[in-house]
Curated annotation (Swiss-Prot):
Site, Transition state stabilizer: residue positions: R14, K22
InterPro entries in alphabetical order: IspD/TarI (IPR034683), IspD/TarI_cytidylyltransf_bact (IPR050088), ISPD_synthase_CS (IPR018294), Nucleotide-diphossugar_trans (IPR029044), TarI (IPR034709)
Protein name per UniProt: Ribitol-5-phosphate cytidylyltransferase
Entry's Gene Ontology BP terms: cell wall organization; isoprenoid biosynthetic process; poly(ribitol phosphate) teichoic acid biosynthetic process
Site (Positions ribitol 5-phosphate for the nucleophilic attack): R161, K218
GO MF term list: 2-C-methyl-D-erythritol 4-phosphate cytidylyltransferase activity; D-ribitol-5-phosphate cytidylyltransferase activity
The organism's place on the tree of life at top rank: Bacteria
Family label: Belongs to the IspD/TarI cytidylyltransferase family. TarI subfamily.
Amino acid sequence: MIYAGILAGGTGTRMGISNLPKQFLELGDRPILIHTIEKFVLEPSIEKIVVGVHGDWVSHAEDLVDKYLPLYKERIIITKGGADRNTSIKKIIEAIDAYRPLTPEDIVVTHDSVRPFITLRMIQDNIQLAQNHDAVDTVVEAVDTIVESTNGQFITDIPNRAHLYQGQTPQTFRCKDFMDLYGSLSDEEKEIWTDACKIFVIKGKDVALAKGEYSNLKITTVTDLKIAKSMIEKD
């Protein structure tokens, strides 16, 4: 089976324009989270869309699904997320297992709730690549020069931009593989390796690159929200 895992566990309100976490802010005529879920609803091969949210916001997320996606709510599971990204993925996979016991071939397409401009093509590319690889990471080519500094004051390296990509989401992999790899980490490693695909890479697994889009914006600041609103208005 193929599942989607939407990471919506953040509680940050640092935009300073609302008491709502950013995934619940309005973008056009509906919340950011709803825009994101809608993109996954369009892919018929996805059995369930599991949304991991902070425990304080589970009821709110369920109410939004009832209001904006009543025809699809049977395909959507709202579950309590974890304290960080990878524990949220773990909670999402546990919710999948509760729905239907996991098999070795079950795949989860994980995605940031605050990237509402994901395309169906990106979702389908992730699913296709995951059939033949251990994991898939969605990326775009680095446009700006990337500068490395180990102390925040002086440049220590300027890597060759031709070899660099900017990571986005989705990130896709088999549910059991993630659970096994994550479970093998020490507590210290879990704190350091916060990116799921990095765990696969460090453990020597095959991680394929899927082509992202520069429009696959992650809305984390007021400026991002302004850009997103402009993009919605143009559509």
